[in-house]
């Protein structure tokens, strides 16, 4: 058996569910209102069924026994005839605040409205539960509140700023109930009104916005006088205090444990007019003072205030004549406590209470401008406070500072004039005939350059360098880099002498130069201000510009010689319009006209620079490293020798001479370059002529086969002994169908039998051998697809001369032969086919084995019944 449920708890829940129902509520307790005010009674309903919007009926009873219909939200004919006229006028109305709430408004409550008011709601519930009406009692009191000014009509007060004033308001009540009064002072200026100070019904003071500081300082106070007078006291009137003052009094009573305002009255007490304080300032219109003297400016004050006001005087300085303080500088200030705030050279004092003097000592030109006097009058307030009652700005006083500028002349001369390019130039700028050049004046210089034009076109000057008053030297764009490199030097020898030196004058430096000497005056803050500029007359830097001339003549002492002899050539140099020249020589060689081996090719052999340092250029004959000599015979003559000349040395030989001019120190400048006449080396011989050709029995091979290429040399003309001939053979290949790519070196064999093989990126290899005296065999082993292309050989013959020396002949080239490498289809597909057939056979056998195993072990069914038992089963079914 289970435990029985707790019966008391169930009964309590059931009772709560049964008791719950509609609840209509109006304010509890008694509502108290004053005759002539508005009565508002709220009513709401909760815990109801039916539509969300509920209707309300109001009834009134003066005694609480019988009620008269007053108003309804849903039935037009509900009100009694007694109240219909007031409903039509709007004195009585219902205002819905929510679907379940409504307010009854009765304007201008009368004593006859005192009684009981009942709020009821028609039923929309399924069952009648709860309360459908609620009643509240209203008491209407007579108007017992009396509010008024202390005098009628309201007075008009005319005050000056800073003067005190008082205003009084009479407020009292004879209400039979316990009520409190609250009072608030307001200031009205047109449509704007401000709360000044309020006394709440609980006896607390509340200053209005903007009056907090004045209230806490005691400047604005509120107190009572007697039993019914409230006094507003202002210790110091401000311009913002002008306007109409009203006294607002409200009466409060406690309802339902809280205070409720039951009526409010306001009365105009007084109109206050604040007269502005008259303040005028007078300063001198214009003042002229000599530089170095003292400036004295007066500011005279005129005002109608005779009470205890204190002036605050401030002097400002600015460069423009307007009266705004923008871009102005404060010079001195005398505060209301007579304390002066100024810089050391400025003083501010007052002769009497209405005249203030500004003294600026030792004025300079920077003190020229406009001076303004700003005066503010301060009146004492409550609790030792001060407030500003007037402020005025004077008209600007124009001050001009005259200066006796120094007098001097500037003279510019050229102490060094260049005769050639790269010569130095030196200019001297001197200051002469100085007058009134005091100790506080400093002289600086600026250098300018102007290009010389043959016509009358105006050319702008270019700044070279400028010196500031603090001796800082700044370079112009034209001279900045050269000055940093030390080519331009600016110096100051004496206080009146400035120098400008160009270490190496170029043709671009030709033109007019002039200097500008500036006078600078020291200011009080130790800064310097430019006061005067004096220009010198220009000095023209120019020299006759003639083109440099360099002539080189080459000659051959021995005009005819044979191969193996020594070749000698001398070069004579002459120059003009080149300063202190030194020469560098370069020997060049060109193939003679008609030589097709390397046409128009100039070869640099050996050189000698201006410091007589010899250098081999493109001399590549390793067997004759010491076979060429270049030496300096005289300052303008050079000799070139070539020992053991060969036939391949035939050509045109020249001397390329460059003249160098010193530019200072160990630096040189290239002045001119010239090429001598050619000296030809021509061997008058009837030697053999060599030709080269390429032959192959296998121009088309299958990949992997051997490629054989023969380079055959033929000799025409004179018959030579095989021991007197040797060859350098090189094989090249162009791996393309055309000759549009660069040739690749395959292998080379020099005349001494040394073989060199080029680097290859695939598996095939090459070999080169000499088959006979005039045949050379190139073999490509294990040919690949990349080995196709054009093949040719290059042959350099060497012939032994009668003197026993070997002479190098011109290099010859064979015509190319095209080699094709084909693919072997059978070999290419043999191994893939064998692999495919093998894999197919293995996969087929594996499939058969898997099928057999599956059918034997996995798919066989086990039969337990015998044939005889099956027959018996069939017999039973048939029976």
UniProtKB/Swiss-Prot annotation:
Entry-linked PANTHER family: PROSTAGLANDIN F2 RECEPTOR NEGATIVE REGULATOR, V-SET AND TRANSMEMBRANE DOMAIN-CONTAINING PROTEIN
Glycosylation sites: 44, 300, 383, 413, 525, 600, 618, 691
Entry function: Inhibits the binding of prostaglandin F2-alpha (PGF2-alpha) to its specific FP receptor, by decreasing the receptor number rather than the affinity constant. Functional coupling with the prostaglandin F2-alpha receptor seems to occur. In myoblasts, associates with tetraspanins CD9 and CD81 to prevent myotube fusion during muscle regeneration.
Gene field: Ptgfrn
Protein name per its UniProtKB record: Prostaglandin F2 receptor negative regulator
Keyword Transmembrane helix: yes
Predominant place of localization: endoplasmic reticulum
Superkingdom of origin organism: Eukaryota
Membrane topology note: Single-pass type I membrane protein
GO process terms (BP): lipid droplet organization; myoblast fusion involved in skeletal muscle regeneration
Residue numbers on the Extracellular membrane side: 22-832
Positions on the Cytoplasmic side per record topology: 854-879
Quaternary structure, from the entry: Interacts with CD9 and CD81. Part of a complex composed of CD9, CD81 and IGSF8. Also seems to interact with CD63, CD82 and CD151.
Every Ig-like C2-type domain range: 22-137, 149-263, 276-389, 406-536, 544-662, 688-813
One Pfam family recorded for the sequence: V-set
Modification type Phosphothreonine: residues: 271
Organism the protein comes from: Mus musculus
InterPro entries, sorted: Ig-like_dom, Ig-like_dom_sf, Ig-like_fold, Ig_sub, Ig_V-set, IgSF_V-set/TM_domain
Cellular component per GO, a single term: Golgi apparatus
Subcellular location: Endoplasmic reticulum membrane; Golgi apparatus, trans-Golgi network membrane
Sequence motif Cell attachment site, residues: 89-91, 703-705
Signal peptide: 1-21
């Amino acid at each position: 058996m289970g435990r029985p449920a707790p019966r008391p708890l169930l009964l309590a829940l059931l009772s709560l569910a049964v008791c719950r129902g509609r609840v209509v509520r109006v304010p509890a307790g008694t509502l108290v209102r004053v005759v002539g005010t508005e009565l508002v009674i709220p009513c709401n309903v909760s815990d109801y069924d039916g539509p969300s919007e509920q209707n309300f009926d109001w009834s009134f009873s003066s005694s609480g026994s019988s009620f008269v219909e007053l108003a309804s939200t849903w039935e037009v004919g509900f009100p009694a005839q007694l109240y219909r006229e007031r409903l039509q006028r709007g004195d009585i109305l219902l205002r819905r605040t929510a679907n379940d709430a409504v307010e009854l408004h009765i304007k201008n409550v009368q004593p006859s409205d005192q009684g009981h008011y009942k709020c009821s709601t028609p039923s929309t519930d399924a069952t009648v539960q709860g309360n459908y009406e609620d009643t509240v009692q209203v008491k209407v009191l007579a108007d017992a509140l009396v509010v008024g000014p202390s005098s009628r009509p309201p007075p008009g007060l005319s005050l000056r700023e800073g003067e005190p004033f008082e205003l009084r308001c009479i407020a009292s009540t004879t209400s039979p109930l316990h009520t409190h009064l609250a009072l608030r002072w307001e200031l009205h200026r047109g449509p704007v009104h401000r709360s000044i100070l309020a006394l709440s019904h609980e006896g607390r003071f509340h200053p209005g916005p903007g009056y907090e500081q004045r209230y806490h300082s005691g400047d604005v106070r509120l107190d009572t006088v007697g039993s019914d007078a409230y006094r507003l006291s202002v210790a110091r009137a401000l311009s913002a205090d002008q306007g109409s003052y009203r006294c607002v009094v409200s009466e409060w009573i406690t309802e339902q444990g809280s205070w409720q305002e039951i009526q409010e009255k306001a009365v105009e007490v007084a109109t206050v007019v604040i007269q502005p304080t008259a303040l005028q300032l007078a300063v001198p219109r214009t003042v002229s003072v000599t530089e170095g003297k003292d400036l004295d400016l007066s500011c005279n004050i005129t005002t109608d205030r005779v009470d205890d006001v204190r002036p605050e005087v401030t002097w400002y300085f600015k460069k423009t004549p307007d009266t705004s303080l923008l871009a102005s500088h404060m010079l001195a200030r005398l505060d209301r406590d007579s304390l002066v705030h100024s810089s050391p050279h400025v003083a501010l004092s007052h002769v009497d209470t209405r005249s203030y003097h500004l003294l600026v000592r030792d004025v300079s030109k920077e003190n020229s401008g406009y001076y303004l006097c700003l005066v503010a009058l301060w009146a004492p307030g409550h609790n030792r406070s001060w407030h500003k009652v007037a402020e005025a700005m004077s008209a600007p006083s124009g001050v001009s500072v005259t200066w006796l500028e120094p007098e001097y002349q500037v003279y510019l001369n050229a102490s060094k004039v260049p005769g050639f390019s790269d010569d130095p130039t030196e200019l001297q700028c001197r200051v002469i005939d100085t007058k009134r050049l005091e100790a506080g004046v400093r002289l600086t210089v600026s250098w300018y350059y102007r290009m010389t034009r043959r016509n009358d076109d105006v050319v702008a000057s270019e700044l070279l360098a400028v010196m500031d008053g603090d001796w800082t030297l700044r370079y112009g764009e034209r001279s900045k880099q050269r000055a940093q490199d030390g080519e331009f030097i600016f110096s100051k020898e004496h206080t009146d002498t400035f120098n400008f030196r160009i270490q190496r004058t170029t043709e671009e430096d030709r033109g007019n130069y002039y200097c500008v000497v500036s006078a600078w005056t020291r200011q009080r803050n130790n800064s310097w201000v430019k006061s005067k500029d004096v220009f010198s007359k220009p000095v023209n830097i120019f020299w006759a510009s003639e083109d440099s001339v360099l002539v080189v003549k080459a000659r051959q002492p021995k005009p005819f010689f044979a191969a193996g002899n020594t070749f000698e050539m001398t070069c004579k140099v002459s120059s003009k319009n080149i300063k202190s020249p030194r020469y560098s020589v370069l020997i060049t060689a060109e193939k003679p006209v008609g030589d097709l081996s390397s046409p128009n090719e100039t070869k640099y052999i050996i050189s000698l620079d201006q410091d007589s340092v010899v250098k081999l250029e493109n001399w590549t004959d390793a067997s004759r490293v010491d076979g060429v000599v270049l030496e300096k015979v005289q300052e303008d003559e050079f000799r070139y020798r070539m020992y053991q000349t060969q036939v391949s040395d035939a050509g045109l030989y020249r001397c390329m001479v460059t003249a160098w001019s010193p530019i200072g120190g160990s630096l040189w400048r290239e002045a001119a370059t010239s090429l001598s006449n050619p000296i030809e080396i021509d061997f008058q011989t009837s030697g053999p002529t060599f030709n080269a050709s390429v032959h192959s029995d296998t121009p088309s091979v299958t990949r992997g086969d051997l490629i054989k290429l023969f380079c055959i040399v033929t000799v025409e003309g004179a018959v030579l002994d095989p021991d007197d001939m040797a060859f350098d053979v090189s094989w090249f290949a162009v791996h393309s169908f055309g000759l549009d790519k660069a040739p690749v070196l395959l292998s080379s064999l020099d005349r001494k039998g040394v073989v060199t093989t080029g680097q290859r990126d695939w598996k095939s290899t090459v070999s080169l051998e000499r088959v006979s005296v005039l045949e050379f065999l190139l073999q490509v082993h294990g040919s690949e697809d990349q080995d196709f292309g054009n093949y040719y050989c290059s042959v350099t013959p060497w012939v032994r001369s009668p003197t026993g020396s070997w002479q190098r002949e011109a290099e010859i080239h064979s015509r190319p032969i095209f080699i094709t490498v084909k693919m072997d289809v059978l070999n290419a597909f043999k191994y893939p086919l064998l692999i495919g057939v093998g894999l197919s056979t293995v996969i087929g056998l594996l499939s058969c084995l898997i099928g057999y195993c599956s059918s034997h072990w996995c798919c066989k069914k086990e039969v337990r019944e015998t044939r005889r038992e099956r027959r018996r089963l069939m017999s039973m079914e048939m029976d």
